[in-house]
Curated annotation (Swiss-Prot):
It comes from the Bacteria. Part of the FGAM synthase complex composed of 1 PurL, 1 PurQ and 2 PurS subunits. This is Phosphoribosylformylglycinamidine synthase subunit PurQ. Its main location: cytoplasm. The active site is at residues 86, 194, 196. It comes from Bacillus anthracis. It catalyses: N(2)-formyl-N(1)-(5-phospho-beta-D-ribosyl)glycinamide + L-glutamine + ATP + H2O = 2-formamido-N(1)-(5-O-phospho-beta-D-ribosyl)acetamidine + L-glutamate + ADP + phosphate + H(+); L-glutamine + H2O = L-glutamate + NH4(+). The gene is purQ. It is found in: Cytoplasm. Keywords: ATP-binding, Cytoplasm, Glutamine amidotransferase, Hydrolase, Ligase, Nucleotide-binding, Purine biosynthesis. GO terms for cellular component: cytoplasm. Residues 3-225 form the Glutamine amidotransferase type-1 domain.
Length: 227
């Protein structure tokens, strides 16, 4: 399986994402610059955290216009797994690939610590290796991770089982304790916590690795078993 890590000016979690795929998952991965127009050779697309374009205007508001995002949109339409973490989640929302918005944290402070997440839906291509309602420890590092959507959108997210992760103790004011959501098709996941920072027991824990293992399992079942 071949992954692409999209690198925007100001990305700073691309190396962590690359490490998670290459060294922990053992799969092929490339850094792909934001002006790339073709992602056809890749099986999965990863949008890392950071401060793309300095977070000017709004987080992700400029990155949504990058050439690579047109290719990401195409990949999403093809059903390829798209994972956006932190700033990557913000970019997915700004691009319209996921509903809602991400606002300043309720306490107006940057937060950097490990939090507990509850797996709300383990039937997605990103969460299949977790148990339903499993509680995992994953780091957060954001100033604008307060997820918001209107009541109608929240109702749709809940009815369609699109809420992948919830905070056990809400750190930022996110509506309904939401930490991560998928699109209706189930192949685009956006989450504020950083699973790529929790892939090695020597570095504090590996409870985020199952996100990437789930992607790999889905791909193998789809393309290897049926080959």
């Amino acid at each position: 399986m071949k992954f692409a890590v999209i690198v925007f000016p100001g990305s700073n979690c691309d190396v962590d994402m690359f490490h998670a795929i290459k060294d922990e998952l053992g799969e092929e991965v490339d850094y792909v610059w934001h002006d790339t127009e073709n992602l056809d050779e890749y099986d999965a697309i990863l949008l890392p955290g950071g401060f793309s374009y300095g977070d000017y205007l709004r987080c992700g508001a400029i990155s949504r216009f990058a050439n690579a995002m047109k290719a990401v949109q195409k990949a999403a339409e093809q059903g390829k797994p798209i994972l956006g973490v932190c700033n990557g989640f913000q970019i997915l929302v700004e691009s319209g690939l996921l509903p809602g918005a991400l606002m300043r944290n309720e306490n107006l402070k940057f937060m950097c610590r490990t939090v507990q997440l509850r797996v709300e839906n383990n039937e997605t291509m990103f969460t299949s290796q977790y148990e339903k309602d499993e509680v995992i420890n994953i780091p957060i590092a954001h100033g604008e991770g307060n997820y918001y959507c209107d009541e109608e959108t929240l109702k749709q997210l809940e009815e369609n089982n699109q809420i992948a992760f919830r905070y056990v103790e809400n750190p930022n004011g996110s509506v309904s304790d939401i930490a991560g959501i998928v699109n209706e098709k189930g192949n685009v996941l956006g989450m504020m916590p950083h699973p790529e920072r929790a892939v090695d027991e020597l570095l504090g824990g590996a409870e985020g690795l199952k996100v990437f293992q789930s992607i790999l399992k889905q791909w193998r079942e789809t393309y290897v078993v049926n080959a």
